[in-house]
């Protein structure tokens, strides 16, 4: 019978590898199942998680996974909840992200908890965070995040 390793303790080796990879800049987030990294998300911000949420295959990977991410705010938290991940480990996590995850039964851990996730200039709130600040429904939140990302990308091109 195959063991199902789901907690932080049972997955600590894979978590250590994921944290090292994120800190080295090799990837931005990782999904872990049974102490194995099953997915490394490349890209900035929430885009790697958002890409996963956009496909059936990606949602299957998220389901029951332990998500390790550089930054987990409410935006990432909504994707994690929609994908039915069971655990979220943020190198940095916002209070609103942590509260949202816990409200949906996702176990959380972080190296640092902050009041808010800043934008890339460090002078304001992240636009992805701002777009879902007042939302609670994960499916509607992820839809809003996809719209916001498309809008931000169209402005920068």
Each predicted region: which residue ranges?
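Conserved mixed alpha/beta catalytic, RNA-binding, or beta-rich assembly cores of soluble enzyme
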Residues: 3-91, 111-131
């Amino acid at each position: 019978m195959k063991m199902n390793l789901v907690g932080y303790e049972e997955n600590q080796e894979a978590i250590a590898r994921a944290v090292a990879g994120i800190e080295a800049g090799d990837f931005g987030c990782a999904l872990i199942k049974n102490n194995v990294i099953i997915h490394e998300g490349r890209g900035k911000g929430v885009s790697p998680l958002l890409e996963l949420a956009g496909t059936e295959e990606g949602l299957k990977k998220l389901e029951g996974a332990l998500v390790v991410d550089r930054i987990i705010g409410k935006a990432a938290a909504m994707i994690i909840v929609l994908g039915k991940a069971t655990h979220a480990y943020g190198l940095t996590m916002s209070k609103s992200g942590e509260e949202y995850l816990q409200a949906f039964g996702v176990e959380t851990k972080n190296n640092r908890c902050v009041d808010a996730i800043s934008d890339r200039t460090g002078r304001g709130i992240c636009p992805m965070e701002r777009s879902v600040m007042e939302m609670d429904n994960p499916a509607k939140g992820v839809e809003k995040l996809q719209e916001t990302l498309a809008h931000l990308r169209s402005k920068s091109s």
